[in-house]
Amino acid sequence: MTAFKIENETIADGFYACPAVYEDAESITGLLVRTAEWLRDRGSNQWSGLLKGQDIHDITGSIEKGHVFVFKKDEELAAVVMLLPAPSEWDRTLWGDDGHEESIYLHRLAVSRRFAGQGLGARVLQWAETGIHFPEKTRIRLDCVADSDALHSFYRRMGYEFMGADASGYHLFEKEITAE
């Protein structure tokens, strides 16, 4: 199990954060697949593997390791995020060999369409920065498809620095956070 401390369980009016449990796996997978369908319908291939039954981030295994966090309102799943305290093989491929010891890797941030348009994605991202503490971690890293200008703008507005693009079509972003 990963060492972390949730500093703030409440992220917005009635929304709260908690580690995902095994019983959440089906609803999380459903949310991720619905998000992938929504992205596909808008011309994006981001997360398209989920539509083929591929789960490169192993949601169930990641839940068991304590890497997945859910955001609920009145017990309804509103959003999800995966925070890896060590790089996956995917992350090592994208980021190379440097900076892993002090980095958290953010994956699979998704908001239920029912709660879209309320700033929940930004609040989840802010929570990942300040609402949870991973000892000795001083930055968050994330990647996204290169062809999503809206997503790139969102991350920049949230204070993430564009670190470059890799040859396979992903843009890399990171943000310094406070470690104690």
UniProtKB/Swiss-Prot annotation:
GO MF assignments: acyltransferase activity, transferring groups other than amino-acyl groups
Domain N-acetyltransferase: 31-180
Enzyme nomenclature, EC number: 2.3.1.-
Keywords, sorted A to Z: Acyltransferase, Transferase
Family to which the UniProt record says this protein belongs: Belongs to the acetyltransferase family.
Protein name: Uncharacterized N-acetyltransferase YesJ
Gene: yesJ
